Amino acid sequence: MSKKTVLALGLAMQGLCLAGIAQAEAPQPSQAAPAQTSVLGSPSQIAFEKQVLRVIETPVMQAEIQRVKALYAADPQGATPAGKATIKRAAESIGVVAAQYAVGEDTDRPGVFWVVNAPHDWFGVHSPRSGYGIENPDNVYRNLIVDGAARYEIHGRIKQPAPAEQHFELRDSIPGTAALSPEGGKQLATLSNEQLQVADDGTFTITLDSSPANGRANHMQMPPEGEFLLIVRDLFTDWETQNPVALDVQRVGGPAIRPLRTDAQVAQRAAKLLSQLAPYWLNYFNQYTYPGQPNHIKQVRVRPGGRGLSSGGYFSLPADEALVLTLDAVGAKSMGIQITDPWGVAYEYADRISSLNNAQAKPNADGTYTFVIAEKDPGVFNWLDPEGHGGGLFAIRWQSVPQGVKPEDAIRSQAVVPLARLREVLPAGTHFVTPSERQAQRAARAASHARRLQ
C-alpha cells in the first residue's frame, strides 16, 4: 500500500460529518516516512528540526510563549470567539517560528532550511505547526541567514514538473524585527526563476556576497556588514505534481569561523526574537487590517520586487451567514486565496481546505472564481474551511501577473449573504459537493500535501 493511500485512508477513517460541522477537531500532522533522498528532508534539515524542538522546550522559551498568550488575550481580538479559541495555537506557532530563525542564524555553518510549515512527522521527528504573518500554503518556504562579510554559493537542481514560480528575496532583517511596514521589512535584492540561468540538466548556482556581479550570472549582492535573510519561495499551483527545487549552500569565504552556540544561547536568542515578532505582527494587523470594515476586500495593491498583486481583509460571520467573493485571475499564473485565524496563522491546510488556488478551485463559466467563507460547510466545492470558527483574516495573491494588468479588475464582487439564500446568489453552474465528496476532496488534498515530505 502506498504512503498516499495510507494517508487518505487515515483521513477517511476519522468519520467526520463535514456538512454543518460546528467545531473542528484538532488537525492531525501529515504523516510520511520519506526516503533519505527527500529534497526537503536532508540530514541538515532533520538536525535543524531537532534543535528547534529542543529550543522550544527550554524554560526561557516556554515563558516567552506564555507572555505571547497574555499579549493576545489582552488584544481586542482576544475577546472575540475565534480570537480567544485560537490564542494557544497562534502563540505556540509563532514561537516555533522564532526558534527556527534563531537556530538558522549560524552564518558560519549555513543551511537552506524549510520553515513555516504544517505539522509533520518524518525521520522519527514530530515538528509542530509553524506559521505567522499569513503564511501561504502554496509556498514551500526556506530561509538562509548570511553574513555580509562572507561569501556563499547556493547550488540548486530543478526537477520537473517545477514549481509555478521560484523566488529568492534578500531582506535587510527578519520580518517583524524592524520598523512597521506593509511588507514587514526592506527588500535588498530579488531573483526569480524567470531571471535564473539554468543548465540543461536543471542545475544552477547563485552567488551571494558584497561585491558587484562583475559578469557573474545569478548573483545577489548584499551589504558588506550585518546579517541578512534570504527567503526562498517555491510556489506550487498543482500540489499533486510540482516538486520543490533541491537547494544546498556553501560558505566559500569570510572571517574566521566562530564556535558553535549552545542550545541555551540559541534559546535566549529565540526568546528575544519572539518578544519582537509577536507584538510586531499584532500591531501590523491592528494597523493595516482591522481598522477596515469586516467582510470586505481591501484595495488591490502591486507588490514590490515583481511579486504580483495582493489584497485581503478580515471576516466576522455568524453561523448562519457566508462571505461570497468572486475574483478574476487577470491572467496570473497563480491566484490563491486563504484564511487564517485572527492572529495570522493559517487555518489547517494539509488535510482541510483553508486555501485554494486557481488550479485547485472550480472556475465559473466566465473564467472567474467564486469562493465561500462560512463557519459551516455549505456544500460548495470552493468553500474555505475556518475549522468551525466565525472569524479570521483572509489574503488573496496574484503571482506571475502579465504586464499591463489593472489591479482594480481583479475583484469582481463581494457580499455577505444568509446561508439559506446562498444558492440563489451563487453563479449558475456552481460546483456543489456531498459530505462524502468533501471527504474525498480532503483526502486527495492531504495526499498531495504529503508529497512535500517525500
Describe the residue ranges of each PLM region:
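A compositional/structural signature for long, glycine/proline-rich flexible linkers
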Residues: 25-454
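Gram-negative bacterial Sec-dependent N-terminal signal peptides
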Residues: 1-23
